[in-house]
């Protein structure tokens, strides 16, 4: 302590006391706090494991309880409770010590009286033995009162225990009559040890059971004593031994040592053999009592199904609200095959039972078993048949629906437990409506599939495969619901579903559910080839009457009439006719599409002026074969057409003139001359109307025709050519070596496309910034057309620069001239002007004088 005080007084270490970094964690914070429910792990043998060797092989004596005490501790509230319990236990121990002091005196008196009774004759000592027995039993009752709880009721095991005691007593009586007094004593002592062992072993389940057994023994012995006869005098010793066993059973760990000491004192007179037996019994008692004490300390271990909870009526009412009463539903979870008979015979056919037949089809099972079959094994087919139970239930469901639904009241809530379990029970029964028959080539194939697949879960469906062998003499006369002999594994898609009844708390009833395959197929987009090969009967839902008739045929009832058979045949014929009509419609649609593909006519109509005329011309040209003419021939044809038109117009004019002017008209007459002139004017107007409208309109028509020709310019088949832009770019960027290789293979694609750089419509590419081409952009691809555009852009830019330079030079020259003019002195310029004017005046005077 002095050294510690010196360290703390030292200024260098003074901050250690205040700095939390140097503080040690208190012991209560070091351990993990646990609930009182886990208190038993500190002293229960189930949690105890002794280590004889450490991890390096050195011998040690260590147990897991030490580790548990090191790391875990009870919470504060539980520790307070444990403190109160310890007080109560200490008080009980004090009471037990008081009772045991009395018990020692009683046991000594009993031993002395036992010796006296052995020495005396049986006839003379009957009254005394009866009195002693009654006194001993009364004393044992008083000693046991402190250990027996008044609230505990007797268990069922107590009856067995009492019956065994009676049997053992009868054996003891027989031994005593045959042997001498000394042998009697030995047999009696051995009998006591046996009586003590047997109830300890059989009735060591809980402490309460032991205490109930004690009560029954005491009542039985008291009744037996009162009704005893002269031939059963030796039961007194057995009763005394029972009292000793009762005291051993009802005692705790600490009181047990005192009982063993009393047993040893009483056993000194009987011999060394009895001492050894008693020691063994005491050791067993200690172990069992320690376990009982552990259980009593830790309380009932409900997690392991041990112990009972006694609650009041109020608690029972509360729990009844929370947990509903059991309605008697015991579902066969994973035990649907428990009633199936077992046999060693292996056949080539397997039966698949207890599956979700609403979702599973024969092809699903065939695909599954094909993946498990051995090499060389073959599965011929998988057929799904209705069971006899399924037929009966389906008949009932057609009339009134599931029986389980009828038993549920209408006003029952949706989350009602009983109604939900009834539906679950129905779904479990629905698994037995059908069964599948797997036909294999050999018993070896069937046994291999059985070993690998029996009890296996199908995907994640919560339905487990139940396989059984079918004897060879069994035949199936019913029509199968579904058959599968082949599966296209490349196109097959596995089914992912979950049976709600077997995998979830909520239950979905499936008796009126539509076929899931039908839903998926109708929602899917079909291809044209699939529509032709499709079986429409699988996806077209027939009327309810037809369904009933078809199901009656499948069930094979004997009571079906001839008229009903006729109706079903008619319905089948109607369905076939409908299917044939659908197929004809599909064939017509496909033929039209094929014709369209052959013609390759995909027209896009744009309403442009002059479209009708141009379309008529195109049709005429195609009919006459003019579209295949060369440009020169087309030019000649146009000239010929113009000549034909002129000839027609002349002929029409001549006919009109002949019709209008009669033969007897005198043209020299002035009256007729004026009329002829008017007719001429009218002719000219008619000709002009025939030739066309005004020149402005003719110009507009020509312009529209030019636009139309430009639009229809690419309609010629010779000009049509497909090109792959990406391949052109790739081939242009290749090295010379690779280009040569492609040239040899004739796979090199050359860029023959030529851009009209001078087209006025695309001049904005060279001037506007919106269409600027950036060669540094990653999306830029170098082609011949792009190079031409860039060259043209550069050329136009140079031209603009030259124009700018020329304009600048002109301006500079003009500025220089102006500057030169401005550079002359104004006085000098005035002098020059005055000289000029004077010279002009002088010359003018001179001329006048000369005249």
Curated annotation (Swiss-Prot):
It comes from the Eukaryota. Keywords: Acetylation, Coiled coil, Nucleus, Phosphoprotein, Transcription, Transcription regulation. Disulfide bonds: none annotated. Residues 90-100, 640-650 have a biased composition (Basic residues). Residues 238-257, 268-295, 312-324, 544-563, 655-667 have a biased composition (Acidic residues). GO terms for cellular component: extracellular space; nucleolus; nucleoplasm. The modification N-acetylserine is found at residue 2. Residues 101-131, 154-165, 197-210, 564-573, 794-824 have a biased composition (Basic and acidic residues). GO terms for molecular function: RNA binding. GO terms for biological process: rRNA processing. Residues 74-134, 148-328, 542-576, 640-667, 794-827 are annotated as: Disordered. The modification Phosphothreonine is found at residues 311, 693. May constitute a novel regulatory system for basal transcription. Negatively regulates ABT1. Belongs to the ESF1 family. This is ESF1 homolog. It comes from Homo sapiens.
């Amino acid at each position: 302590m002095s050294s510690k005080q010196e360290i703390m007084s030292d200024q260098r270490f003074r901050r250690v006391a205040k700095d939390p970094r140097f503080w040690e964690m208190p012991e209560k914070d070091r351990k993990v706090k646990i609930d009182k429910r886990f208190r038993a792990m500190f002293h229960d043998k189930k949690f105890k494991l002794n280590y004889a060797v450490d991890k390096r092989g050195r011998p040690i004596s260590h147990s897991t309880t030490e580790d548990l005490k090191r790391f875990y501790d009870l919470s504060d509230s539980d520790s307070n409770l444990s403190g109160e319990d310890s007080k109560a236990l200490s008080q009980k121990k004090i009471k037990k010590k008081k009772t045991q002091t009395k018990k020692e005196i009683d046991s000594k008196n009993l031993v002395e009286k036992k010796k006296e009774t052995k020495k005396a004759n049986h006839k003379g000592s009957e009254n005394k033995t009866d009195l002693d027995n009654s006194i001993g039993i009364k004393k044992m009752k008083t000693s046991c009162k402190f250990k027996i709880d008044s609230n505990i009721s007797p268990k069922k095991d107590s009856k067995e225990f009492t019956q065994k005691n009676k049997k053992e007593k009868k054996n003891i009586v027989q031994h005593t009559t045959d042997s001498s007094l000394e042998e009697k004593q030995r047999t009696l002592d051995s009998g006591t040890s046996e009586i003590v062992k047997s109830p300890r072993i059989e009735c060591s389940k809980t402490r309460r059971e032991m205490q109930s057994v004690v009560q029954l023994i005491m009542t039985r012995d008291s009744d037996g004593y009162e009704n005893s006869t002269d031939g059963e005098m030796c039961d007194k010793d057995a009763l005394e031994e029972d009292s000793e066993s009762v005291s051993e059973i009802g005692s705790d760990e600490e009181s047990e040592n005192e009982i063993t000491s009393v047993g040893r004192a009483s056993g000194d007179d009987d011999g060394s053999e009895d001492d050894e037996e008693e020691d063994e019994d005491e050791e067993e008692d200690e172990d069992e009592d320690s376990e009982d004490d552990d259980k009593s300390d830790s309380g009932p271990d409900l997690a392991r199904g041990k112990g009972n909870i006694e609650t009041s009526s109020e608690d029972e009412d509360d729990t009844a609200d929370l947990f509903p009463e059991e309605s008697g539903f015991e579902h066969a979870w994973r035990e649907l095959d428990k009633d199936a008979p077992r046999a060693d015979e292996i056949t080539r056919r397997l039966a698949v039972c207890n599956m979700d037949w609403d979702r599973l089809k024969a092809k699903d099972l065939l695909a599954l078993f094909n993946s498990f079959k051995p090499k060389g094994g073959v599965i011929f087919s998988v057929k799904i048949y209705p069971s006899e139970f399924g037929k009966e239930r389906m008949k009932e469901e057609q009339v009134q629906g599931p029986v389980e639904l009828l038993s549920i009241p209408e006003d029952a809530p949706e989350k009602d437990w009983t109604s939900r379990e009834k539906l679950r029970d129905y779904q479990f029964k629905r698994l037995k409506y059908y069964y599948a028959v797997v036909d294999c080539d050999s018993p070896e194939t069937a046994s291999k599939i059985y070993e690998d697949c029996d009890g296996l879960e199908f995907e994640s469906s919560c339905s487990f495969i139940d396989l059984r062998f079918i004897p060879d003499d069994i035949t199936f006369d019913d029509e199968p619901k579904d058959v599968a002999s082949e599966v296209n594994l490349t196109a097959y898609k596995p089914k992912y579903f979950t049976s709600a009844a077997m995998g979830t708390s909520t239950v979905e009833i499936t008796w009126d559910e539509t076929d899931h395959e039908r839903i998926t197929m109708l929602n899917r987009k079909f291809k044209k080839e699939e529509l032709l090969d499709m079986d429409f009967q699988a996806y077209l839902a027939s009327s309810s009457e037809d369904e009933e008739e078809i199901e009656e045929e499948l069930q094979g009832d004997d009571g079906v009439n001839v008229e009903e058979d006729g109706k079903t045949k008619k319905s089948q014929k109607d369905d076939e006719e409908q299917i044939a009509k659908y197929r004809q419609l599909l064939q017509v649609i496909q033929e039209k599409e094929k014709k369209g593909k052959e013609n390759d006519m995909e027209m896009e109509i744009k309403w442009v002026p002059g479209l009708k005329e141009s379309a008529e011309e195109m049709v005429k040209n195609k009919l006459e074969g003019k579209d295949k003419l060369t440009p020169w021939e087309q030019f000649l044809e146009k000239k010929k057409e113009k000549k034909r038109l002129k000839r027609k117009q002349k002929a029409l004019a001549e006919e009109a003139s002949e019709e209008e002017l009669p033969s007897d008209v005198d043209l020299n007459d002035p009256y007729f001359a004026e009329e002829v002139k008017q007719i001429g004017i009218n002719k000219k107007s008619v000709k002009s109307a025939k030739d066309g409208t005004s020149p402005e309109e003719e110009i507009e028509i020509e312009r529209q025709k030019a636009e139309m020709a430009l639009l229809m310019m690419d309609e010629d088949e010779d000009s049509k050519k497909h090109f792959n832009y990406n391949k052109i770019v790739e081939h242009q960027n290749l090295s010379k070596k690779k280009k040569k290789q492609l040239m040899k293979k004739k796979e090199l694609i050359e860029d023959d496309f030529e851009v009209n750089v001078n087209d006025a419509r695309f001049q904005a590419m060279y001037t506007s910034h919106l269409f600027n081409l950036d060669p540094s952009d990653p999306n830029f691809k170098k082609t011949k057309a792009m190079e031409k555009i860039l060259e043209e852009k550069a050329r136009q830019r140079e031209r603009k620069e030259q124009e700018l330079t020329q304009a600048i030079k002109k301006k500079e020259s003009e500025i220089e001239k102006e500057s030169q003019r401005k550079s002359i002195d104004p006085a000098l310029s005035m002098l020059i002007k005055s000289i000029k004017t004077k010279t002009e005046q002088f010359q003018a005077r001179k001329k006048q004088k000369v005249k």
